[in-house]
C-alpha cells in the first residue's frame, strides 16, 4: 500500500516536469514550422522538385528499388523501410523550395541507411513491436496499480514498459542526425543545391532534428516524474 508523499491522481508538484516537457515540445514544433515556412519561400536555383531530387539522390546511391510516393498532409514525409517506400507530403513532393528539397534529401538519407544496414536504424526497427506494446499497456498498468490500492509491482511494471519509449526515442536521435548529415553532404556533392542554399537546408533539418530531441527530453522528464512518485514505494 502507498504511504507518505502520494499526491493521488490530481495535481502534485511533479507535474511541473510534464509542463516543462510540453513547453519544450511546443517550442521545438513552432521553430520547425517557422523555419520550414521561411525556406519554403526560397526557390532552389536548380529548379528541380523535391521528388526529382529524391530520385536523383537515390539513383546516385545505387538505389533503384525504393518507390517515391505522394502522400497527403504537411511535413508528414517519411521513409518506410518495411515496404521500401519514400513518402513525400503535399508540401514537399512538387515543391522546388530549399526546404522541401532538404526534407526529401533527409528521407533519402534514411533509405541509404537502410540499404547500408545502418545499425541504429536496424535496432530501432527491431524494437518497434516491443515499444508499441509497452506504450499501449504502460499507463493502464500504472492506473490499475493505483486503483488496486497502490500495487507497487503493477505500477513499476508499467513504469518499466514506459521506459521503452524513452529508449526508442534515444535510439532515434543518432538515426535522425545521421540522415540529416548524409542529406546535406549529398546535396552539396551532387550540386542539387548551391552553397548558399545548403545553409538554408541545414537550418530546416536542424530545426526538425530538435523536435526529436524535445520528444526525448519530454519522455525522460515524464519517466523521472513516475520514478519520483512511485520509485521509492513498496507493497505492504
Task: Identify the role of each PLM range.
Residues 1-8, 30-134, 167-223, 228-236:
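Polar-ligand-bearing catalytic/cofactor-coordination segments
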Residues 2, 145-160, 229-236:
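Membrane-interfacial helix-loop-helix connectors in multipass membrane proteins
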Residues 6-35, 145, 152, 157-159, ...:
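Hydrophobic alpha-helical transmembrane segments of small proteolipidic membrane proteins, enriched
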Residues 18, 132-135, 139, 159-162:
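Residues within membrane-spanning alpha-helices of integral membrane proteins
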Residues 128-151:
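Post-HExxH zinc-binding segment in Zn-dependent metallohydrolases
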